[in-house]
C-alpha cells in the first residue's frame, strides 16, 4: 500500500529526515523541537514521495497501531489480530494498523514483563515508523493487507490484553511445563476468570511454546489444563521465582481481562426428592397456585346454562 493511499483513507502521516530530525544513528527517535513532531505538517495525497525521508504514522482513536515487540506476539499476531489495513515495520511484521468502528480516547497501552516491553497498543499522542531507515542497514517497509473490516474498541482491547498476558507467560516460563501450568492456570482461576477464556489463553500459550518433538504435546497439555480447572484447588504465581514487580505486572493484566469477561460460575446440580417423601409431606397451600386453579373453574360454572324446567 502506498503512502498516498493511506493518506486518502484519512490516516495521519508525517515525514522526517533521518540524521537531521533524529539524534545520530537513532533514526526512529524524532527530536526536532521546532516544530515538535506532534506539530509536523501532515503528508497530503498529492505530495511527491521523498526517497531520503522517513515516513511515520500518527495513530489516533480511529486508527490504532498494534506494536508486536516480542517473538511470541509476532508468532500469535494473526490469531488475535487477523486482517488489518496494513502491516509495517522491520521485515514488514512488527506493526499492524486497524480501524476502530467506535473511536474511544486513549493514548498508549503497554504490557511489560520486568523491564522488557512485549506489546503496545498506540493511539493519539504516539508515532510509529512506516517506511524508511530504522538503523544504518535496517529499513521499515509497508505491506498492504486490504482488510477494511473495523474492530470495536472492546474487541481490540480484549485481543491486546489476552495476547499480552500470553507474552508475559512465555517470558516468565520456568521449570517443568506442567508445574508452570498449575501456577498460571490456578492464578487466573483464582481471579474468577471465565474458564473458557482461560482455555483459549492456554491453547494459544501452548501454540507459542509448541514442542513438535514431543508427541501429542498440545493434546496432553490441554488435558492438564482441564484437570487443573476441574480440581478447584488453585495454585498461584507467587510460587514461581518471579519478582514482586513481575507478579504485579501479570496480575494487573489478569484483572483487566476479568473486568471484560463474565465471571465463571460453577454449574448448580439439581436436588432430587423421592416420590414417597413428597407424598408423605404435608405441604402448606400456596394461595397464588390455588387461586390460579380455582378461578377458571368458577368462570366455567358461571357460564354453564341452567338445566331443568323453564
Where are these regions (language model features)?
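Short boundary motifs at domain starts and secondary-structure transition points
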Residues: 57, 170-174, 291-292
Amino acid at each position: 500500500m502506498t503512502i498516498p493511499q493511506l493518506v486518502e483513507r484519512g490516516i495521519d502521516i508525517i515525514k522526517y529526515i533521518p540524521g537531521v530530525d533524529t539524534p545520530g544513528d537513532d533514526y526512529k527517535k524524532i527530536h526536532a523541537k521546532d516544530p515538535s513532531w506532534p506539530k509536523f505538517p501532515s503528508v497530503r495525497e498529492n505530495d511527491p514521495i521523498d526517497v531520503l525521508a522517513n515516513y511515520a504514522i500518527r495513530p489516533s482513536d480511529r486508527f490504532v497501531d498494534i506494536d508486536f515487540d516480542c517473538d511470541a506476539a509476532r508468532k500469535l499476531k494473526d490469531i488475535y489480530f487477523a486482517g488489518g489495513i496494513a502491516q509495517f515495520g522491520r521485515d514488514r511484521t512488527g506493526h499492524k494498523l486497524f480501524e476502530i468502528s467506535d473511536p474511544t480516547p486513549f493514548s498508549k497501552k503497554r504490557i511489560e514483563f520486568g523491564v522488557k516491553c512485549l506489546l503496545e497498543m498506540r493511539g493519539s499522542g504516539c508515532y510509529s515508523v512506516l517506511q524508511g531507515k530504522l538503523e544504518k542497514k535496517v529499513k521499515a517497509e509497508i505491506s498492504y493487507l486490504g482488510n477494511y473490516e473495523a474492530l470495536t474498541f472492546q474487541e481490540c482491547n480484549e485481543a491486546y490484553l489476552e495476547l499480552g498476558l500470553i507474552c508475559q507467560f512465555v517470558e516468565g516460563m520456568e521449570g517443568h511445563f506442567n508445574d508452570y501450568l498449575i501456577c498460571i492456570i490456578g492464578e487466573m482461576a483464582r481471579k474468577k476468570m471465565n474458564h473458557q477464556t482461560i482455555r483459549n489463553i492456554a491453547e494459544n500459550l501452548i501454540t507459542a511454546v509448541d514442542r513438535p518433538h514431543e508427541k501429542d504435546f498440545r493434546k496432553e497439555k490441554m488435558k492438564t489444563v482441564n484437570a487443573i480447572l476441574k480440581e478447584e484447588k488453585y495454585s498461584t504465581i507467587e510460587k514461581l521465582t518471579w519478582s514482586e514487580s513481575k507478579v504485579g505486572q501479570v496480575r494487573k493484566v489478569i484483572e483487566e481481562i476479568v473486568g471484560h469477561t463474565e465471571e465463571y460460575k460453577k454449574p448448580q446440580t439439581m436436588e432430587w426428592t423421592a416420590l414417597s417423601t413428597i407424598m408423605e409431606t404435608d405441604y402448606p397451600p400456596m394461595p397464588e397456585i390455588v387461586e390460579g386453579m380455582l378461578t377458571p373453574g368458577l368462570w366455567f360454572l358461571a357460564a354453564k346454562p341452567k338445566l331443568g324446567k323453564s
